[in-house]
């Protein structure tokens, strides 16, 4: 999983895949030897990490961390363009706006195609996001009605909104440590002959990334994305 907001040959980057995580999608008909050949290329020849997913899990996660954010980011720049104070707002925009709208700067046709390909998952996430934002808007409306003093219920909802994501903040703080990879827990995976697809999917759900193979059905993984 790698990329940026740019497109075209002139935007190619030889370091794009450095340290990248690969997601290999398999199903019940995937032959282990074929999976193993691709996995070996990734960990041995590319020196990268990998996780194993099924198509459904891959598409849902891609919608969550890529496709839905592209829509949200695009909605933000649409909101600015439609605002009568857009020129002032654009002049005042700094780091927060830049970071949250970066992916909206990519080719809109590419973004549209990406979103349309995963429409059902993106729709569900956007409705979840709309519910979260509506809840916050309702809390703020209550504060306005109370002249800035939230009710006990509103205060509780406000606190919950801003602390719910704390596990992700802590996870990101850990990944910024220069020796993060060295301190990740290492686990050995014994890959069975049957049911290996589901076993490796559950490994990915625990945040384990395969970093090498010590045998045909023996892999070593690091716990790299446990939120």
Give the residues covered by each predicted segment.
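Short linear motifs at secondary-structure transitions and domain/linker junctions
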Residues: 1-3, 47-52, 77, 88-91, ...
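Active-site-proximal catalytic alpha-helix in oxidoreductases
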Residues: 32-46, 57-109, 123-131
């Amino acid at each position: 999983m790698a990329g940026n907001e740019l497109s075209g040959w002139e935007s190619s980057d030889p370091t794009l895949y450095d340290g990248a995580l690969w997601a290999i999608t398999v199903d019940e008909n995937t032959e282990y030897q074929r999976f193993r050949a691709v996995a070996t290329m990734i960990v041995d020849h590319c020196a990268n990490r990998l996780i194993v997913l099924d198509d459904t899990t891959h598409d849902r996660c891609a919608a969550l961390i890529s496709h839905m954010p592209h829509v949200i980011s695009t909605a933000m720049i649409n909101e600015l363009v439609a605002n009568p104070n857009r020129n002032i707002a654009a002049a005042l925009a700094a780091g927060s706006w830049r970071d949250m709208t970066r992916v909206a700067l990519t080719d809109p046709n590419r973004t549209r195609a990406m979103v349309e390909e995963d429409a059902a998952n993106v729709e569900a996430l956007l409705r979840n996001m709309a519910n979260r934002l509506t809840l916050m808007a309702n809390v703020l409306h209550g504060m306005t009605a109370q002249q800035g003093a939230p009710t006990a219920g509103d205060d509780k909802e406000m606190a919950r909104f801003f602390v719910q994501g704390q596990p992700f903040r802590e996870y990101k703080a850990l990944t910024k440590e220069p020796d993060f990879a060295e301190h990740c827990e290492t686990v050995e995976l014994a890959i069975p002959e049957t049911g290996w697809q589901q076993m490796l999917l559950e490994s990915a759900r625990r945040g384990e990334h395969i970093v090498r193979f010590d045998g045909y059905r023996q892999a070593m993984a690091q716990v790299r994305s446990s939120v």
